[in-house]
């Protein structure tokens, strides 16, 4: 895209390698363990996950990312089963996070941290991030001395590098990094749709990280899969390039920026793994023709009122009505993209046992948890108007 392309080419020389501030990382692509292969009984398919881990490490990658709340704790234990119990400790990098909904005061943090080590089957974390930082929960972390406790754990050798993951405006990020210059790395949402988005502020947050000389980890490079399920006319533009999956352009876009040391992808099956590894094993930045194509894709997507939900499910964890909000938003997006029959079919399937959009009581708990700052209550009213007939 015109703005993005100028920004990238000023900072990334074709053929150069990424900075790799942290030498433990073998490549600039990581396995996000928020969305794993699942069995029908709701458990992680550790047989399939183990195969994916083997393929990932076998291709020369070694970075894994999890959090205590991912899959209700099953992500951590699946990593113990499929990764840490099967490989020597120096074969992988493991990142975990301190999530605000799992502690209230300083005394809660060390026991929680120890439980995370045990769940993952390790003695230390390579990276430990203050999770989903924003203006509101940063006050909770400060009052509980979360950063100070993490720095103490680092001195004890239980954390190698301290970082944050972030979901808020650039000025808040600037404030946090100014308050705690000991933070070594920042994880931000970054993709070609959110680059100039005023809600997510990918570009502005990127600029703040560069201002503070902080290496960057990227989450949501395909925006929860929405940059894989493109409208037909947008997809045709990428198809015209003559090769590469839709995910490949999104992930390579993020990885092409100077200072971005790691791009995460949540891979739920071996097909995703195979595709991602194929173009990140020997990474090359996007060329001018590819940037121009992405610019056209952005214009098409922005011309349509799609709901920018990433399916993180933070909202559903808070919803007292058990409304499957991300799935209902996906149905609405399908309808907008003219997949009318499938949208109605899936809506009825997802709500067969309750949780229809019209059951929202407008408590607002979902909106306070949403990293995308979506007006979920209003959006559910629109969903209800479309499907609850």
Regions inferred by a protein language model and the residue ranges of each:
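Hydrophobic faces of well-ordered beta-strands that scaffold small-molecule active sites
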Residues: 27-31, 64-66, 94-96, 128-130, ...
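N-terminal binding-site loop/beta-alpha segment at the start of enzyme catalytic domains
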Residues: 6-92, 149, 155
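Structural motif corresponding to the early beta-alpha repeats
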Residues: 70, 86-106, 131
